[in-house]
């Protein structure tokens, strides 16, 4: 039973009340009385509005279901369908033209282009690694991944392999020649780097000296000008550093003593309270808020054991250099942090309102993450985040402009409680629900003075695509979804609308996640598509991936690319509304079995860690043992696809159960090396995780918008109660 404290009309879990009063509030200049009184007013006023918005979602979905049911067996009439969506208020008239008015935005968001990490803030180690991923070793990223092949004696091995190391050095020199070309010759032939008369001087093998083709790319150095330890260069708005140490193991093998190239990598990171965490009660929420507090105060630390030794990981300091004129240059040492609050759907029993109801979790997150961010705003931190006095909050899973307007209202109310200037709280709008996509311009307009980010989330968006049209018929296989007409239009529409509403220079236009953290050669080949599509940020699964993805922003001048794209014909809403129905469902029995098994295995691999271990984001081996980053968004697709096929008779419930049981054995085998893992087989009936996975599919048509949170939260609480956690 949760111990509670009565605060006005609110019943607050004691663990949360104590954290807020004893840890979060001191140093903010906000009194506890002011905060709790204001919080209660916000909850009393806005919780009913939140509830009404959710009812509107259900009402629209019921109407869409009914429309399709009434036309079962008929060919889809796209024109009639569009007219129907307009009639029920799903598809709204296009908003009048406007320009975003966001002010006081940090350069990492407004004027730079580069990778973005998303990490569960519940995990302090992941949070610290991401914060520190602003700068990453190119040599390590190349040496430790499949970007450099192991052919020709270049195996990774246990010790340093010079054959592999030489390949890394050659790759890095080629990058230097591309990003910072010399006036004559090549970085490959460099024998020394020095600073003379305010310029970078590069000595070459043939005895000559040269400089940069564009001398302005050299910004500063560390150490002695004649023999610098580091040389700082800039290209396409991104910094990188040639690190020099002839006495180091790698530097000894390099003609110029270069030991590494340090890349400016994860410009921004989303500290996630949402899809990548498993937080179901007050205890869990306090873990999240406490880690966010550590990030905002700059004192988050974690004991890390590696290679037999233990050390304390902390947030990196800023990087300090000497300019050619002798003055000091300081660059931000850490990724600029967003915090992703939860959406409007879930409630959490951390607070009960005056009627004893759980309070919407999104309202709680808005209040607490903003309160905590005051430590950064007022300088009560050793590691500054925003230098422009802003707090960056990503708001996910909003359906249409009314919900965006509600977020704008919530943020205004929170600012008033905390005594913050209007529009201090900025918003990142996830374009990951169909009703937001087709009304994106109006959604941005509803928060036009706060918006700092729009981002396509292909995974959740596909889940909503399937659920919205659940009654229309059987959808295509998961692997075919990316080549459906709607998705290309969706991705282009996000860029088109973002540019048309003046986000360039004020906000990020982002793209989604590379979900295969071990396949970095493939990422390096393919993910350049995101900056080419006009995105000035895109998601990566690890600091190493951020370092490698940064290379793409040196190849593509995103802001110039956006200027080109602004001239194209905007994406068509008719294309976006094209339902991804299978032209026929005459797949072979083997194809159906493979699709069901693949989805069942992914569902179980993720759900078992969520329910049993409280892990909301992990690298889950797929059916072919390829590690895939899974979070609730991937779960939403897999469960909704199987629910759709079940609904339309492509598969039977018996097939689903049989596949889940077979795949549970596979997942148990894949997790056999984890001492804390609890096998699902053979006791399926009593295994909470297995039953949760089954429920997500069998009850998938009845889940609100296809979301997985209601089942996951209830089942995780069941598991915790059953095991005394």
From Swiss-Prot:
The modification Cysteine sulfenic acid (-SOH) is found at residue 617. GO terms for molecular function: magnesium ion binding; malate synthase activity. Coiled coil: none annotated. Pfam families: MS_C, MS_N, MS_TIM-barrel, MSG_insertion. Mg(2+) binds at residues 432, 460. GO terms for cellular component: cytosol. It is an enzyme of class 2 (transferase). Glyoxylate binds at residues 340, 432, 457-460. It is found in: Cytoplasm. Its EC number is 2.3.3.9. Acetyl-CoA binds at residues 118, 125-126, 276, 313, 541. GO terms for biological process: glyoxylate catabolic process; glyoxylate cycle; tricarboxylic acid cycle. Keywords: Cytoplasm, Glyoxylate bypass, Magnesium, Metal-binding, Oxidation, Transferase, Tricarboxylic acid cycle. It catalyses: glyoxylate + acetyl-CoA + H2O = (S)-malate + CoA + H(+). Its cofactor is Mg(2+). Belongs to the malate synthase family. GlcB subfamily. Involved in the glycolate utilization. Catalyzes the condensation and subsequent hydrolysis of acetyl-coenzyme A (acetyl-CoA) and glyoxylate to form malate and CoA. Monomer. This is Malate synthase G. It comes from Pseudomonas aeruginosa (strain LESB58).
């Amino acid at each position: 039973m949760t111990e509670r404290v009565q605060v006005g009309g609110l019943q607050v879990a004691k663990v949360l009340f104590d954290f807020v009063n004893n840890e979060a509030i001191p140093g903010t200049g906000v009194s506890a009385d002011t905060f709790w009184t204001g919080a209660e007013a916000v909850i009393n006023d806005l919780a009913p509005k939140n509830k009404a918005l959710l009812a509107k979602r259900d009402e629209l979905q019921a109407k869409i279901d009914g429309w399709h049911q009434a036309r079962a067996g008929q060919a889809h009439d796209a024109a009639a369908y569009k007219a129907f969506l307009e009639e029920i208020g799903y598809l709204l008239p296009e908003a009048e033209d406007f320009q975003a008015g966001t002010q006081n935005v940090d350069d990492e968001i407004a004027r730079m282009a580069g990778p973005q990490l998303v990490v569960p803030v519940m995990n302090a180690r992941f949070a610290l690694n991401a914060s520190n991923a602003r700068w990453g070793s190119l040599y390590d990223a190349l040496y430790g991944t499949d970007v450099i092949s192991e052919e020709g004696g270049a195996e990774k091995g246990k010790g340093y392999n010079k054959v592999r190391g030489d390949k890394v050095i050659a790759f890095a020199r080629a990058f230097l020649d591309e990003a910072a070309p010399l006036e004559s010759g090549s970085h490959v032939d460099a024998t020394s780097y020095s600073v003379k008369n305010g310029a970078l001087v590069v000595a070459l093998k043939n005895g000559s000296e040269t400089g940069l083709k564009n001398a302005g790319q050299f910004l500063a150095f560390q150490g002695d000008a004649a023999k610098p330890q580091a040389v700082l260069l800039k290209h396409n708005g991104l910094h990188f550093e040639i690190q020099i140490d002839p006495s180091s193991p790698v530097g000894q093998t390099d003609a110029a003593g270069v030991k590494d190239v340090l890349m400016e990598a994860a410009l921004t990171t989303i500290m996630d309270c949402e899809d990548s965490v498993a937080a179901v009660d007050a205890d869990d929420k306090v873990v999240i808020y406490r880690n966010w507090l550590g990030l905002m105060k700059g004192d988050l630390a974690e004991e890390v054991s590696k290679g037999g030794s233990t050390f304390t990981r902390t947030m990196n300091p800023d990087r300090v250099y000497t300019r050619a004129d002798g003055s000091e240059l300081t660059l931000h040492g850490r990724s600029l942090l967003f915090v992703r609050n939860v959406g409007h759907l879930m409630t959490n029993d951390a607070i009960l309102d005056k009627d004893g109801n759980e309070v919407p979790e999104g309202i709680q997150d808005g209040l607490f993450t903003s309160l905590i961010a005051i430590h950064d705003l007022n300088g009560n931190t050793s590691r500054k985040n925003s230098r422009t006095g802003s707090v960056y909050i990503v708001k996910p899973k909003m359906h249409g402009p009314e919900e965006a307007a509600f977020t704008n209202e919530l943020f205004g109310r929170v600012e008033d409680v905390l005594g913050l200037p209007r529009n201090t709280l900025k918003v990142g709008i996830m374009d990951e629900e169909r009703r937001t996509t087709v009304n994106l311009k109006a959604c941005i307009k509803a928060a036009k003075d706060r918006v700092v980010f729009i981002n396509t989330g292909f995974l959740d968006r596909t889940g909503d695509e399937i659920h919205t049209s659940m009654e229309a018929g059987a959808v295509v296989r998961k692997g075919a979804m990316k080549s459906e007409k709607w998705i290309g239009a969706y991705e282009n529409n996000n860029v088109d609308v973002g540019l048309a509403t003046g986000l360039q220079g004020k906000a990020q236009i982002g793209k989604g996640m590379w979900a295969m953290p071990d396949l970095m050669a493939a990422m390096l080949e393919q993910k350049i598509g995101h900056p080419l599509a006009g995105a000035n940020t895109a998601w990566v699964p690890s600091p190493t991936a951020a370092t490698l993805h940064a290379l793409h922003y040196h190849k593509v001048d995103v802001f110039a690319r956006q200027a080109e794209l602004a001239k194209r014909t905007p994406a068509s809403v008719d294309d976006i509304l094209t339902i991804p129905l299978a032209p026929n469902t005459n797949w072979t029995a083997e194809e159906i079995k493979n699709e069901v098994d693949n989805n069942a295995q992914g569902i179980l691999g993720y759900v078992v860690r969520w329910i049993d271990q409280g892990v909301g984001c992990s690298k889950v081996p797929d059916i072919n043992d390829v590690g895939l980053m899974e979070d609730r968004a991937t779960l939403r697709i897999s469960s909704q696809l199987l629910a759709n096929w079940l609904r339309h008779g492509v598969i039977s419930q018996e097939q689903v159960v049989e596949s889940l049981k077979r795949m549970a054995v596979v997942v148990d085998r894949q997790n056999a090396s984890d001492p804390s893992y609890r096998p699902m087989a053979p006791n399926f009936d009593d295994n909470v995780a297995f039953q949760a996975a089954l429920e997500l599919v069998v009850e998938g048509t009845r889940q609100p918008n296809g979301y997985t949170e209601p089942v996951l939260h209830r089942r995780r609480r069941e598991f915790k109660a059953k095991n005394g956690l």
